A protein has these predicted regions:
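N-terminal hydrophobic targeting/anchoring segments and the immediately downstream early-domain regions
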Residues: 1-132
């Protein structure tokens, strides 16, 4: 399921490691769950990308290209993975709609999800041009 280690303190087996993953933000669902259990109810999940940096690190052989450096291809992939994480969290909690993590698309949905005690996740996009 995961392409990197998720253990943090005290081992730090995989992160932080800027040389290996300078363009990759990690977000393990258990870390979000811990924040939700502590009372966090609203999160903005930015699909953040920068094709210039991606092209530079690939061109200088700092990192191999795993996916396209095209901004919108990367944004679509990040959004798809956010929905996949929602489905995964639901599956861990009994099925569709049962997890703490809910992607919302309207203020009304956010209020409903927060009122139900779940975490409302707003999708955003930020690219090298400063946003879309």
């Amino acid at each position: 399921m995961f392409n990197h280690e998720t253990a943090g303190y005290p081992d730090f087996t995989e992160w932080p490691n800027a040389r290996k993953s300078s363009t990759h933000q990690t977000q393990y669902y258990r870390w979000l769950e811990r924040a939700w259990m502590g009372g966090l109810r609203l999160v903005v999940q930015h699909a953040t990308t920068n094709s210039i940096i991606c092209d530079m690190v690939v061109g200088n052989a700092v990192q191999a290209t795993r996916y396209s450096c095209n901004d919108m291809v990367a944004v679509d992939r990040i959004i798809d993975e956010t929905y996949a994480m929602e489905r995964y969290i639901d599956a861990q909690n009994g099925g569709p709609g049962t997890g703490f993590f809910r992607v919302v698309t309207t203020p009304e949905q956010a209020r409903e999800v927060i009122g139900a005690g779940q975490m409302a996740v707003i999708l955003g996009i930020e690219d090298r041009r400063g946003g879309i």
